[in-house]
UniProtKB/Swiss-Prot annotation:
Organism of derivation: Serratia marcescens
Underlying gene: thrB
InterPro entries linked to this entry: GHMP_kinase_C_dom (IPR013750), GHMP_kinase_C_sf (IPR036554), GHMP_kinase_N_dom (IPR006204), GHMP_knse_ATP-bd_CS (IPR006203), Homoserine_kinase (IPR000870), Ribosomal_Su5_D2-typ_SF (IPR020568), Ribsml_uS5_D2-typ_fold_subgr (IPR014721)
GO MF term list: ATP binding; homoserine kinase activity
NCBIfam families registered for this protein in UniProt: PRK01212.1-4, thrB
Pfam families the record matches: GHMP_kinases_C, GHMP_kinases_N
Family listed: Belongs to the GHMP kinase family. Homoserine kinase subfamily.
Subcellular locations according to the entry: Cytoplasm
Protein name in UniProt: Homoserine kinase
Pathway(s) this gene product operates in, as recorded in its UniProt entry: Amino-acid biosynthesis; L-threonine biosynthesis; L-threonine from L-aspartate: step 4/5
Catalytic activity entry: L-homoserine + ATP = O-phospho-L-homoserine + ADP + H(+)
Length: 309
């Protein structure tokens, strides 16, 4: 049997709409992500389990893990009879790369089970394609960090889909999911079709400056440049309490605060444990809306998707 864990991820990381993503894992060892296991069988089957299993489609063929199996078999040119099991531990529509977790774990598990017939770039291309079926367009800012780990910049040139950007090991990423759902398609539909020239210039400056600051090891500058002029001004209305949380993050001393993916999860970057604990406590008390919500203090997950056991 093969079992793969795929971690949560932050799409956009504020400053890089659709082109930047970061994998994260809680510092307490909690597995914040999905697992998919594959074992030999006479015919294909898919079993669903996990905390958020009730949120999955009732029709098995609408399950993205079934579609991963189907597309993988198509790619290698033969049908592989297996029993698959999805542990759905990630809330759907959370802004934590939930669908990417299932896609990455499903495709990587199949590839490992079949002795890796597909290379990493081919597999990542399939991951983007499958994730695009859910979000409505192909973008790699969740699947790339989820699969490869770390902070990833999407390049999509010269046969390269993404490459890792050096980040800061002492940064703590406080992740808060309020327990409500925001669909990626809805969050994309709210964005304008065109942007002002000044916003385009600002976006280019922030993104280029952030990447430069990461490579030249300037954490304060990097954090200051983590600003979103593309999505956050429009998506804030979908996120109850976000404006208050951002204000609290500044007062508590977080380096940066933003929307994870299309929300409703937010992240706050802190450079010491005490600040992260204060931020987590505030979010636990003020940002969570029901008992499905949670707060985790995380670090970048540099390993990405990996075999368990």
């Amino acid at each position: 049997m093969v079992k793969v864990y795929a971690p949560a991820s932050i799409g956009n990381v504020s400053v890089g709409f659709d082109v930047l993503g970061a994998a994260v894992s809680p510092i307490d060892g909690t597995l914040l992500g999905d697992c998919v296991s594959v074992e030999a069988a006479e015919t294909f089957s898919l079993q669903n389990a996990g905390r958020f299993v009730s949120k999955l489609p009732a029709e098995p063929k609408e399950n993205i893990v079934y579609q991963c199996w189907e597309r993988f078999c198509q790619e290698i040119g033969r049908e592989v009879p297996v029993a698959m099991r999805l542990e759905k531990n990630m809330p759907i529509g959370s802004g934590l790369g939930s669908s990417a977790c299932s896609v990455v774990a499903g495709l990587m598990a199949m590839n490992e089970f079949c002795d890796r017939p597909l290379d990493k770039t081919t597999l990542l291309g399939l991951m983007g394609e499958l994730e695009g079926r859910i979000s409505g367009s192909v973008h790699y800012d969740n699947v790339a960090p989820c699969y490869l780990g770390g902070l990833q910049l999407m390049l999509e040139e010269e046969g390269i889909i993404s490459q890792e950007v050096p980040c800061f090991d002492d940064w703590l990423w406080v992740m808060a999911y309020p327990g409500i759902k925001v669909s990626t398609a809805e969050a994309r539909a709210i964005l304008p079709a065109q942007y002002r020239r000044q916003d385009c210039i600002s976006h280019g400056r922030y993104l280029a400056g952030f990447i430069h600051a990461c490579h030249t090891r300037q954490p304060q500058l990097a954090a200051k440049l983590m600003q979103d002029v593309i999505a956050e001004p429009y998506r804030t209305r979908l996120l109850p309490g976000f404006a208050e949380a951002r204000k609290a993050a500044q007062e508590i001393g977080a380096l940066a605060c933003g929307i994870s993916g299309s929300g409703p999860t937010l992240f706050a970057v802190c450079n010491d444990g005490a600040t992260a604990q204060r931020m987590a406590a505030w979010l636990q008390q003020h940002y969570l809306q029901n008992d499905e919500g949670f707060v985790h203090i995380c670090r970048l997950d540099t390993a990405g998707a990996r075999l368990l056991g």
